[in-house]
Amino acid sequence: MALPAEISVSFDFSSGATFGYPLTLGDAKYGLLGTGTLAASEVPEPVVDLTPDVYSISIRRGRNIMRDQYEAGTATVRVLDPLSYFNPQNTASPYYGYLTPLRKLRVAATYAGTSYFLYSGYTTEYRYTYPQGQETGYVDIVCNDAFRLMQQAAITTVASATAGQDTGTRVSAILNQVTFPTNMRSIDTGNTTCVADPGTSRTSLDALLNAAYSEQGAFFINSSGTAVFKNRTNTITSASATPIEFNQSGGIPYKNLVFAFDDKLIINSASMTRVGGSAQLAENAASIVKYFSHQTNETNLIAQTDADALNIAKIYVATRAETTIRIDAMTVDLLDTAVPTGTMLGLEYFTALKITNKQPDGSTIVKTLQCQGLDWNITPNQMQVTVTTLEPITDGFTLDSAVQGIIGTSVLAY
């Protein structure tokens, strides 16, 4: 059965973090201003199409529910290799001498004339296998997204990271410090101001996640490889968008709902300490009586004042003091003709989702959630995505919202 979208896998042998084709003057393909990327010429052709030899694709991206933060997106692409092109010691290979770690790989899907990136990352491992009794070997190309680059880049001081700048400006300063490409950023202006950079030894990823936490926003790498920083306001209001409906009668069909009803995500006591400040405590007494104490403690936040730290503690507890039945994940099969392919390919973090599930007794469970993870499994005969779904990571009151605009229920954010 043909897949509902045309899948392509491109492999870029050029160095650097930027995805794209190098600009080549006079070339019909690479000589387009605004399309080609300024880069040194390479041999072999910098970007090659691996699609004809791809056997399977596995992509894992999303927010870790228990750690409450985004993690590096990973991908494993299995490529059949009948001519041993991916053998790094094969001098006859056109890739000889260029097959190194941290080259760029992208997975895209094209549907109805529109292309969607499903993954953009950097190779970290080549697992070559020659199965016994088979004539054709294969290589598993293992990739991580730009979080890997940021985790490897240690920093002490950050240039231009002065007191009073907003968290979005601080995120940009950290990315500048590690020379992350400016054309691969989408940075909101922060709602919170920062202390001067503390000058401690840490990874750039730790510094970026600290800024996002101090904002109570989000920092992640999207499917096109862009570093995205969402401020608190946009994180909150994203939950009020018109949701995509998934159900068993007219909406997008699904399977394998993962239900949970437990205390794992409850936080009813939070202590937040900024750099140079004192611990600020917020608690929900009713939640503590009901569920016992569930505590969290964060230190060295870069929020500028103790009042900011207290607000972080308050909104963190307000968002997590209660629990209810959860839908943590669902699987959608794109081979099902009732599934709108373009809609599923366009999902990204913070997309609003409304899931309705009919129970055997005729009752229903209805949850309005957000997409916070996408796991793709693609072969010549399969195209499925498992969607991680979560309640909003930061609650707040939004006027005219049926979900976030309920007086007496919705959280008044700062």
Model-predicted segments: where are they?
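Assembly/oligomerization scaffold segments
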Residues: 1-165, 195-216, 221-223, 251-255, ...
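Secondary-structure boundary/capping motif
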Residues: 76-78, 239, 386
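Fold-independent oxyanion-binding glycine-rich loops
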Residues: 146, 187, 232
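Helix-boundary capping/turn motifs
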Residues: 72, 183, 346-347
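Short beta-strand-alpha-helix junction that forms the catalytic/metal-binding core
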Residues: 141-142, 385-388
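N-terminal export/assembly leaders
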Residues: 151, 171-199
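Acidic, small/polar-enriched beta strand-loop surface segments
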Residues: 1-51, 160-168, 206-372, 376-381, ...
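Generic structural signal for short, solvent-exposed loop/turn connectors between secondary structure elements
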Residues: 156, 179-185, 277-279
